[in-house]
Structure formats: C-alpha cells, structure tokens
C-alpha cells in the first residue's frame, strides 16, 4: 500500500491550521505586542489587588464597628460629594499637568492616607473618636439622626470608607483605563481588553485567599516579631502594608510603560490634555449632557450601581449576624472573593471570544441579565418564607440567615465576575471610537460621577428611610427594594440595546 505524499501534506496543513486557530482563540496577542500587554496586565493586577483588599477592609471595619445601615449614609452623604470634588480636581489637573504626573500624584495621595491610617489613626482610634457616653447622649436626644451621629463619631472609619470607595473609580476606571484607551487601537481593544483579566483578575482569587488566611498570617507575624499590637490592629496593618507594596510596584510599572515599553507614537497618544482651548468644569458637564453616547454609558454605570447596592445592603446586614469582628468579616469576604476570582477567570476565557465572535451587544447584555436573575432569587429568599422553606426542604441549609447569606454571596460572585470582565471591557470599548476630547472629559464625568450616582441614588433612598423611621431595618424594607431593583434592571437592559446602536454608528464614523 502506497501513501500519497499530497494527502500527507494536506493532513499536515490541516493540523497546522487547526493549532493556529486554537492558539489565536486562546492567546490572540501578536508577538510584538507581548511586552506591552504583559506590563499593562501587571499594572492592572496591582491596582485590582489593592482594590479588593481595601474593599474588604472598609466593609469589615464599618459594618462590624459601626453598623451595616451606616453604609447607605456614607455612600450618599460622603462618597458622592467626594466623587464630584474628585472630578472637579481631575478636570483642573488635566488642563494643567502632564498625564504621567497626574497618575503619580493621585496614586501617592491614596497610598499616603493608607499608611497614616494603618500606623497612626487606627491604633489610636479610641482616643481620636468621641467618647461612647457623648455618642449615646446625642443619639438619645436626636434619635432620627442617630446614624449621622455614628458616622461623625467614628470619623476615621468613615473617612477610610470614602477614600477606599474612590479608589476603583478614580484609579482603576479613570486613570488606568484612560491611559490604556489612549495607547490602544480599536482593533487591539477587541483582543486586549477581555484578556487583560486573564492574569490580572487572579488578584481577586489571591486577595480572597490572603484574607481567608489573615488570622494565620496574623499569628505568624506576631510570633515571628514578638509584636504587642492588638489582634485586629495588626490585621489591618498587615493588609495595608501589602497595599503599600503593591502601590509602589504599580508606580514603577507605569513608569516602565511610559519610558521603556511604549514607542514615541504611543507616548504622543498619552496627552490627556485636549489640544483645543481648555474647557471649564461647567463646559465639561455640558459636553457630557450633549452626548447621547456618553449619557448611555453613564446610564449603564448608574443602573449597575443601583442594582448591586440594593442587594448588597440587606446581604451585608445578614452577614454581620454571624461574622461580628473585622477579622472574621474580612475572612468571610475573602471566601467569596476567591470564588469570584475563579468565576472571573472563566468569564475572561469566554468573554474574549464572545466579543470577537458574537459581537459587542451579546457580551454587554450578559451582566445585566445575570444581576437581574440572581438578584430576583435573593429577594425571593429574603422576602418570601415559602420560597425559603422550599430551599430548606431541598438543600442542607437550615438556618434562614445562612440561606440569605449564601444566595447573596452567589449573587455577588456571579455579578462581580461578569462585571469585572464583560461589563468593564465592553464599556471601555464603547469609548474607543469617540472624539479625543469627549473620550477624555466625558469619560471623567461618566465614570466617576455616573458610578457614584448609581450607588448613591439607592443609598439616598435607604438612608432617607432610616432617618424617617429610626427603627426600620433592611428586612422591613426589602420588598420595596425588590420593586426598585426590577425597574432598574429593565432600564439597564434598554440602555445596553441603545448603546449598541450608538457604538456601531461611532465606529463607522471614525473609520
């Protein structure tokens, strides 16, 4: 029997073609792009690792040492005004400083505060805060303002919460993504953006594992260095020391990208300042309102913030019934962060190919659908005893509080996993074909204010209820929250469909 050489050659060609397609499917980065891609990924890893550590820490401190209900007050009365102030400062900086220096300045301010909180403020918080007797007397005389009194009496915890809340939207959403948008083409963004999370999002899993083992790390450090600090103080210092180290690595990585990795063409694109006459803050907001494209992006951010906040409040309140100290609560958050990291990597692998093969809309609509479905499930368990009883009858969970915590954790894991990958990447892709001036200043308003307005909008409603009805709890207002949640998710789905049309038109116009 003879073998036809042409058949062998054809088979070999088919095999090579198959492996080539498989390689492109898994790793669509071209050889000359590897260094650029990996350095951006390292920068993203550091920023997100910090983000997850301080997010867990702020909730652990505020929820266990003040109360879960205080979060709604902080988000509206503290975080939202700070977001507006930060936007005003950023627009001024854009018109006066180099983009690279803006990055260094803002990162340094955050890191300086975290260092002060870890080693000066928190160890002395009892001395710096109001006395318990004074607080109790004020709350007794002004019961409707008791949460404001708590907020001000524990001012350092409140300030830490506000600063930590600004990090993901100022550093990650604004500084990092604006930098990446300016050095990435539309064609590169389709391959780069979903895959940025493939390595960087492992920071979620590692942060979760770190927090889960915080007690063991604390014991090791105490024995190793014979420290006399209190258990919870040392836990907070350990977390924030890691934050400081990662922050320094992020600054160094950003410097290397600017001076060693990017070529002159990319450096020219890193001019955040518009070439036209500098715009005032009022003109910047007017530009935002005049752009339907930016308004729709802001709508997505607002809806996401409202939907997530409506579920997180009751969920965190339920969690404090079981996890009563900052270290215990941080370990609990670490456990669901670990699962979030695993599912995020899964979404990264699927998401990069969803964008390339099924298009922008399919990738963008997955997150609101996941949030909607899992959120409805949580509220059903939380509000309707018969539904919770059905779960008890079919699963091993028998504690109603544990059922709510578990369903809420599942909701958070799936929502955050899809948000960190599909939602963030498709949102950033929507900015790429825009005019440079709209991309820069419109993005500042949409990202910072849009995100915070979403969280603060629902926070205002919740805080208003707690002011009017001091005895109200998350359980008693949960049905109301569910109705608002449904309306928000339906609006989110509509805005996604409308933005898809705008995105396609912008790409055609830019080509």
From Swiss-Prot:
Tell me where the signal peptide lies. none
Q: How does it sit in the membrane?
A: Multi-pass membrane protein
Entry GO MF terms: ATP binding; ATP:ADP antiporter activity
Acetylation as a keyword of this entry, yes or no, is: no
Gene Ontology terms, cellular component aspect?
A: plasma membrane
Q: In which domain of life is the source organism classified?
A: Bacteria
The residues that cross the membrane are 34-54, 70-90, 102-122, 157-177, 192-212, 231-251, 296-316, 330-350, 361-381, 390-410, 453-473, 476-496
- Give the primary localization class: membrane
The places in or outside the cell where this protein is found are: Cell membrane
What are the entry keywords? ATP-binding, Cell membrane, Membrane, Nucleotide-binding, Transmembrane, Transmembrane helix, Transport
What is its biological role?
A: Provides the rickettsial cell with host ATP in exchange for rickettsial ADP. This is an obligate exchange system. This energy acquiring activity is an important component of rickettsial parasitism.
The similarity annotation says: Belongs to the ADP/ATP translocase tlc family.
Q: Which NCBIfam families match?
A: AAA
Q: Would you tell me the protein name for this molecule? A: ADP,ATP carrier protein 4
């Amino acid at each position: 029997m003879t073998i036809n050489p042409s058949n062998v050659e054809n088979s070999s060609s088919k095999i090579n073609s198959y492996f080539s397609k498989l390689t492109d499917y898994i790793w669509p980065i071209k050889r000359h792009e590897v260094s650029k891609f990996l350095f951006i990924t390292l920068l993203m890893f550091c920023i997100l690792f910090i983000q997850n550590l301080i997010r867990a820490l702020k909730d652990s401190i505020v929820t266990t040492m003040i109360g879960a209900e205080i979060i709604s007050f902080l988000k509206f009365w503290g975080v939202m005004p700070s977001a507006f102030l930060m936007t005003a400062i950023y627009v001024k900086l854009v018109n006066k400083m180099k983009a690279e220096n803006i990055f260094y300045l803002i990162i340094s301010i955050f890191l300086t505060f975290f260092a002060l909180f870890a080693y000066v403020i928190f160890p002395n918080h009892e001395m710096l805060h109001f006395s318990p007797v004074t607080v109790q007397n004020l709350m007794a005389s002004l019961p409707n303002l008791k949460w404001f009194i708590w907020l001000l009496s524990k001012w350092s915890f409140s300030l830490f919460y506000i600063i930590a809340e600004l990090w993901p939207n100022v550093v990650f959403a604004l500084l990092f993504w604006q930098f990446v948008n300016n050095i990435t083409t539309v064609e590169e963004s389709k391959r780069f953006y979903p895959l940025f999370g493939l390595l960087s999002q492992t920071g979620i899993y590692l942060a979760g594992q770190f927090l889960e083992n915080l007690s063991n790390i604390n014991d090791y450090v105490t024995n190793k260095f014979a420290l006399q600090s209190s258990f919870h103080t040392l836990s907070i210092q350990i977390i924030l020391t890691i934050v400081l180290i990662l922050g320094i690595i992020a600054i160094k990585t950003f410097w290397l990208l600017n001076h060693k990795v990017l070529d002159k063409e990319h450096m020219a694109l890193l001019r955040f300042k518009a070439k036209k006459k500098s715009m005032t803050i009022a003109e910047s907001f007017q530009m935002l309102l005049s752009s339907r494209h930016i308004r729709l992006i802001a709508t997505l951010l607002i809806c996401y913030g409202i939907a997530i906040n409506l579920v997180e409040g009751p969920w965190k309140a339920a969690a404090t019934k079981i996890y009563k100290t900052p270290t215990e609560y941080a370990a609990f958050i670490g456990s669901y962060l670990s699962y979030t990291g695993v599912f995020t990597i899964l979404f990264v692998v699927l998401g990069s190919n969803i964008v390339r093969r099924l298009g922008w809309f399919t990738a963008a609509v997955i997150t609101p659908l996941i949030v909607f479905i899992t959120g409805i499930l949580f509220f059903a368990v939380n509000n309707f005893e018969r539904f919770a009883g059905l779960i008890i009858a079919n699963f091993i969970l028998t504690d109603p509080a544990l059922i709510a915590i578990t369903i809420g954790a599942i909701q958070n894991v799936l929502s955050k996993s899809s948000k960190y990958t599909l939602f963030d990447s498709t949102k950033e892709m929507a900015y790429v074909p825009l005019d440079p001036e709209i991309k820069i200043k419109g993005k500042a308003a949409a990202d910072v204010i849009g995100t915070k307005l979403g969280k603060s909008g629902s926070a205002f409603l919740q805080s208003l209820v707690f002011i009017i009805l001091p005895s109200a709890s998350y359980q008693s207002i949960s049905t109301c929250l569910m109705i608002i949640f449904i309306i928000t998710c339906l609006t989110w789905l509509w805005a996604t469909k409308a933005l898809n049309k705008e995105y396609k038109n912008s790409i055609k116009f830019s080509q």
